[in-house]
Design a protein with these regions (language model features):
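Carboxylate-rich, polar loop motifs that coordinate divalent cations or form catalytic acidic clusters
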Residues: 1-270
Length: 270
């Protein structure tokens, strides 16, 4: 789902337009499984998907179809009802689903089948933990999967193997509590921590640079809880924190803060 600060900018042309727009509310009375919606995605067939605290929902423009744990579809079902994130695969007809405590799920919406990836102590190539906070497309077509307790996973879709990037494998990484990442497409991974600021990881050699808020430096990170990181079409890196929005300049390694004029909420998240 696009970050709220991006929606703010996208809504400006709508607000300036004279065209009337109708807003429809879609809640449990319309068939949504739960009103606490944590993530939204649109698939390649045009359907909207809503992840909630109580199941997965597909909306066809008229009605909702719900997907719950223990509902078997062609052999398997979704592994948990408490969800955190969705990603429509950039290449394949797959909806990726991150759960709070039940691993990573892949839903093939053409063939109506689920595949799941859970932590397995006996398999070091399995996902390192079942608590998934975000799923992001990697520059090479694979996936980055962030977790709340065990760092970042790189998922090779062809082999089904996970490669672990955490404080045990990346010396100097600020923490293993990760909200999100963005693939810079330049061999660098931009990382948002739960409490420990912002990091830049050189994927090949695993060198890392960490950035935290400095109250004496107006060009530092606004806040240390980084909920969203976004690379725009001009390769700018936008960072959403608990204390406002910032634009990161990779050349100077400074942040331009957008948190003082009252136009944006200080808490930026996706």
């Amino acid at each position: 789902m696009k970050s709220r600060f991006l929606l703010y900018f996208l809504l400006i042309p709508i607000l300036l337009s004279a065209q009337p727009y109708a807003v429809r509310q879609l809640g449990i009375e319309k068939g949504l499984s739960n009103n606490y919606v944590v993530s939204i995605a649109q698939d390649k067939e045009g359907f909207l998907w809503f992840a909630t605290e109580e199941g997965l929902n597909k909306f066809d423009g008229t009605r909702f179809i719900t997907y719950y744990k223990n509902e078997i579809r062609n052999g398997y079902g979704i592994t948990g009802n408490e969800l955190n994130c969705l990603l429509d695969d950039p290449k394949d007809s797959i909806l990726w689903i991150g759960t709070q405590r039940a691993g990573l799920n892949a839903y093939d919406y053409v063939n109506d089948t689920f595949t799941f990836y859970r932590h397995n102590e006996a398999a070091p190539e399995s996902i390192i933990t079942d608590d998934v906070t975000n799923i992001v497309a990697a520059d090479d077509g694979n996936l980055w999967v962030t977790t709340y307790w065990k760092g970042i996973e790189y998922f090779d879709k062809e082999t089904g193997h996970f490669f672990h990037y955490n404080t045990a494998t990346v010396p100097g990484l600020a923490s293993d509590n990760i909200w999100t990442v963005a693939d810079g497409g330049n061999g660098k991974l931009y990382i948002g921590h739960v409490h420990h600021g912002f990091s830049i990881l050189s994927i090949k050699d695993k060198k890392v640079r960490n950035f935290v808020h400095d109250p004496n430096n107006r060009n530092s990170l606004p806040g240390n809880e980084v909920r969203c990181v976004y690379k725009d079409m001009n390769h700018n890196i936008w960072v959403g924190t608990n204390k406002g929005l910032a634009l990161f300049n990779p050349e100077s390694e400074n942040f331009i803060q957008f948190n003082s004029d009252g136009n944006l909420s200080h808490y930026i998240y996706d």
